[in-house]
Amino acid sequence: MKRLQIKLNAFESLDSTNTYLKKLAAEGASEGTVVIANAQTAGRGRMGRSFASAQGLGVYMSLLLRPDCAASCAQSLTANTAAAVCMAIETVSGVKPEIKWVNDLYLKGKKICGILCESAVSGDKLDYAVIGIGLNVITRPEDFPEELRHTAGSIYSQTGLIIERGKLISAILTELGGMYAAWCEDKSAYLNEYKSRCTMLGRVVTVISPDGDYDALAKDITPDFGLVVETVDGETRTLHSGEISVKI
């Protein structure tokens, strides 16, 4: 079974842990290299969005993996990571985060964590994957930019719990090590865990598409972590990328 050998690199501040680790990866850094920053000045999320990363209030970290697999496996790695991070948060805090497909973690209706997987490919194989995790731990509502206050939260803002960031980092790395070993053997290893936390299943969602947005019923998650939806016309579609919003 594959085991990660963690090599930790800690910084007071970086522009982005993912950006920094991608540079190390391109220079030949070994699998298991981790970059952690106390703050990010240009934290990034999916689809080019910024990620607010205030000084000392969250966990901002990236992990380098070099799996022997097809490039198409990147989405399953991201989804398995989301499930593993949920498990780590629950272990330390006792609260159970939910997953919004594909990789956003929510607690009591607000986003507390984002996961960004960026990869390099050689032919049809993954050369490396950098998994970035941005987790809001003790961030207060007033610490977020005003435009994010209605959607963003933290473990503290949603529960009143003050959790030591070091304990969360340790738990996350432990869970990621177990997840990666399982994922290398079975790309859908955490599928059931993922589905149990994907509370949008059975609800109406809006699929945001270049061809026009549409409403659909979220029905299932496939073994490769596609989202199965049923349109109002009764057509079943499987989404492997894109953006959705959940109807309240």
Question: What annotation goes with each model-predicted range?
Answer:
Residues 124-156:
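Short, acidic (Asp/Glu-rich) active-site segment that either coordinates a divalent metal cofactor
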Residues 61-63, 99, 117, 131-135, ...:
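Preference for bulky hydrophobic residues occupying beta-strand positions
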Residues 36, 114-116, 130-131, 141:
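Beta-strand scaffold of nucleotide-dependent catalytic cores
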Residues 201-248:
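Conserved RNA-binding domains used in RNP assembly and mRNA/RNA metabolism
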Residues 17, 43, 61, 85, ...:
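Residue-level signal for inorganic ion chemistry
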Residues 87-124, 134:
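Acidic (Asp/Glu) carboxylate-rich active-site/surface patches
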